[in-house]
Amino acid sequence: MSQQQDKQPSENKLWGGRFTGATDPLMDLYNASLPYDKVMYDADLTGTKVYTQGLNKLGLITTEELNLIHQGLEQIRQEWHDNKFIIKAGDEDIHTANERRLGEIIGKNISGKVHTGRSRNDQVATDMRIFVRESLLNLSKILHQFITAILERAHKEIDVLMPGYTHLQKAQPIRWAHWLSSYATYFTEDYKRLQEIITRVNQSPLGSGALAGHPYGIDREFLAKGLGFDGVIGNSLTAVSDRDFVVESLFWSTLFMNHISRFSEDLIIYSSGEFGFIKLADAYSTGSSLMPQKKNPDSLELLRGKSGRVFGQLSGFLMSIKSIPSTYNKDMQEDKEPLFDALTTVEHSILIATGVISTLSIDKQNMEKALTMDMLATDLADYLVRKGVPFRETHHISGECVRKAEEEKLSGIDQLSFEQFQQIDSRFEKDVMETFDFEASVERRDALGGTAKSAVLKQLENLKSILS
């Protein structure tokens, strides 16, 4: 037997009694999660505080012991908060570290009762749900602020017209506020989904033990209420092994980042010299180390780039859990790094996006100068529809007008003479020239969801009512 195998396992290991040989130091490092799960210190201490209240109700901890435990837990909380908590060898995870420190403060004869009937399986599941719930509530708050900033901008700049694009080609005139409302709609749907996920996250696994349930009949509903959960997970096997809430949180983060990526891509294009529709504030731009004239939209490019990072966290975690058997397996430890990274990335992304949209300036003149008369070709077709001509026929006629203007090298279809319109189709009348007005074009799109001023204002009010 090697010298390493002769060593006794660390006294700090919660599971050390079964083993006679020490673990490989690399295995200790490979197995440890404290470097990243220490962010859950507050959730872990809160969970233990309420759990010991449940043990006190059962008579397994005296009230005097409970008070000492709670005092010790609050001291540990303060140490973590002040960055004074000392991590020691054998602190495998946040649960081990906190329990070890509690023993140092109040003595192991009392701290040793804290884990009665509890497993790290239900403990970590509880910590995760508390941490994720609080993280998602924070995301909900700042996402609300982001959407509100978009809506306020849309109200303020409701009268600004710009080209709308399909295939990145000029399509039809729209209101700048309509574009803003479009993304506000995406983000409001994200906001609504987030509320649904928070409801599903907020279920308590505490009191499920390792897998089979609690041996002392602890009041799980009491524990759930004390921790702010809406209810309990009704099956102990599921309670310790369910990570659907992690997957949902990652999927939500992925979908949101997809939306923020598209939002950023549009703004990157609009900020380019070729478009010149918007200008980012200096606070959200950077320069070039070589070219003094450059003002780069790095904030938006990072928002776009970090979406791929979050997508990867989701796909990676799904691969980690796709084939694991029921109840708890160590694979589940791989839930934390991708989730914590994704939640932090999304939080920072929302804050950056809020700053960008709140501080950018628009160039109304450039937006309106980019409008071209060929964008009113559909309006020309609609003109004939109102004269009773079938749309498929009017579409063809309007296309002929566009082709004629190109052949004549005219700047737009509005430059065709009335006689030329009549040569193409005799049903054109002199009022056809009234078609070529961008403001009139957008105002004709007044159906629900359209780009007319009344329609956009209704969209903004609807979104505002959802948020309120």
Curated annotation (Swiss-Prot):
Gene3D superfamilies: Fumarase/aspartase (C-terminal domain), Fumarase/aspartase (Central domain), Fumarase/aspartase (N-terminal domain)
Metabolic or biological pathway, per its Swiss-Prot or TrEMBL entry: Amino-acid biosynthesis; L-arginine biosynthesis; L-arginine from L-ornithine and carbamoyl phosphate: step 3/3
Binding residue positions for 2-(N(omega)-L-arginino)succinate: S33, N121, T166, N296, Y328, Q333, K336
Molecular function in Gene Ontology: argininosuccinate lyase activity
Catalytic residues (positions): H167 (proton acceptor), S288 (proton donor)
UniProt keyword terms in alphabetical order: Amino-acid biosynthesis, Arginine biosynthesis, Lyase
Amino-acid biosynthesis keyword on record: yes
Family annotation (Pfam families): ASL_C2, Lyase_1
Entry's EC annotation: 4.3.2.1
GO biological process: one example: arginine biosynthetic process via ornithine
Superkingdom to which the source organism belongs: Eukaryota
UniProt site positions, description: Increases basicity of active site His: E301
Reaction(s) this enzyme catalyzes, per UniProt: 2-(N(omega)-L-arginino)succinate = fumarate + L-arginine
Cellular component terms (Gene Ontology): cytosol
PANTHER family: ARGININOSUCCINATE LYASE (PTHR43814:SF1)
Family matches, as NCBIfam families: argH
Family affiliation: Belongs to the lyase 1 family. Argininosuccinate lyase subfamily.
Subunit structure: Homotetramer.
UniProt-recorded name of the protein: Argininosuccinate lyase
Species assigned in the record: Candida albicans (Yeast)
Gene designation: ARG4
